[in-house]
Each structure stands twice: as structure tokens, then as C-alpha cells.
From Swiss-Prot:
Cross-referenced PROSITE patterns: MACRO
UniProt EC number: 3.1.3.84
Protein name: ADP-ribose 1''-phosphate phosphatase
Catalytic activity, reaction form: ADP-alpha-D-ribose 1''-phosphate + H2O = ADP-D-ribose + phosphate
Family label: Belongs to the POA1 family.
Positions contributing to substrate binding: 9-11, 24-26, 31-36, 149-155
Key word Coiled coil present: no
Cited SUPFAM superfamilies: Macro domain-like
Protein's organism: Candida glabrata (strain ATCC 2001 / BCRC 20586 / JCM 3761 / NBRC 0622 / NRRL Y-65 / CBS 138)
Keywords in alphabetical order: Hydrolase, Protein phosphatase
InterPro entries: ADP-ribose_metab_enzymes, Macro_dom, Macro_dom-like
Residue span, Macro domain: 1-179
Name of the coding gene: POA1
GO MF term list: ADP-ribosyl-[dinitrogen reductase] hydrolase activity; phosphoprotein phosphatase activity
Amino acid sequence: MSNIHYIKGNILKGRTYKRIIIHSCNANGAWGGGIAYQLAVKHPKAEEVYVDLCERFGQKLLGKCVVIPSYSDDDVLIGCLFTSIFGGASHGSGTSIVDYTDKALSHFDELLAKEQSKSDNANLDKEIEKLLKLKSGVLKDYKLEMPKINSGIFGVPWPETEEVLKKYDRSMNFTVYEL
């Protein structure tokens, strides 16, 4: 049985359950396009937190997952998979984005299991853990939802990212929204 379930619909539409909206993003502090832009419009305080993290930690965020409260809906967290240094036309190669997606999902898997971060940067770990304390409930109680990450602005063919998601079939189940 697959750990990926596809549905058609708008990922940003309100739901009656706890969920983490996962997206891939750059470490340059720009939620300027795609789902990231839509998240910024809907959850501006979350974007402020993201920008602050990027300004303070930059490329040290690559391959990490940071879970940010939406600040506008207690049932929504935003899972940022840092897969590229820059966004837009300056993003990394498809291979590096897929590799960083795998690393970020591995980091996310650790967060789900322990609700704490372990990396080579103690200050970044403290920030990640501080943000985790702002949520209500346990991370494992949240459904994991995403668009077809990496396939928009980053230009990675969806099957490449899909293969990475399948690697986490023992610990994570994803609902992927298609338009």
C-alpha cells in the first residue's frame, strides 16, 4: 500500500482537522511564487518567521525541515522543506533539489519521532524546537499534506520527488493535492 494518496482540490481550503501543509522552499527568504506565495498571502506572520530564519541561518537551512505555526489557524502548521538556496530562475539543479528534499524529509521524520532537532548547528536546533513548542498537540497527530512539491518553479519532474516520498512509507503518509 502506498504512503501517497492523491486528491483533487485546493490545499489552502479550510479543513476541520490538524494538518501540516508541506512545501519546498529556498533559503533566501523569498516566498515569491507558487504555493509559497499563496501561503505568504494567507499566513503573513508565518512568512515573517520564515524570512527571519533565512536571514539568520541562510544556506545552513538546506536539507532541513522547519515547522512554522500558521498564526492564523490553530489547526494548520507549515512544513518548510529547504531544498534550494535561491528561488525563481536561480534555483539549484533538479538533482540537488531532490537530494535536499530527501535530507529535509529525513530531518522531518526525526522531528515527527522526537519533536526535537539534531544538526550541526545548535542555534538552528533551538529555533526549530522553539517553533515546535508553539503548536497545539503532538506533531504525529497532524495529517501531512502537500502540492506536487518541486514540480512547479523548481522544475523537477514529479516522479523524481514521488520516489523520495515513497522512501518514507514506514513513517509518513502524504496527501498530495492536484489541481
